[in-house]
């Protein structure tokens, strides 16, 4: 994975690198490989992730149809 450092701006390059790694799922992969996960635990985790995905899709569908109010946008304090 490559990141260009422009004008010696290392902070920006690190942010870009971190964002790329996040998109590629590298942090999740490193966490998963840090310790052995039993096959039964893996199945349970994957099943839980699938349930969360389905709930999220159902919630979004209800919001699109107008049966649920849309979530409120968080206002940042500056």
Curated annotation (Swiss-Prot):
Keywords: Ribonucleoprotein, Ribosomal protein. Residues 30-78 are annotated as: Disordered. GO terms for biological process: translation. GO terms for molecular function: structural constituent of ribosome. InterPro entries: Ribosomal_bS21, Ribosomal_bS21_sf. GO terms for cellular component: ribonucleoprotein complex; ribosome. This is Small ribosomal subunit protein bS21A. The lineage of its organism: Bacteria, Pseudomonadati, Pseudomonadota, Alphaproteobacteria, Hyphomicrobiales.
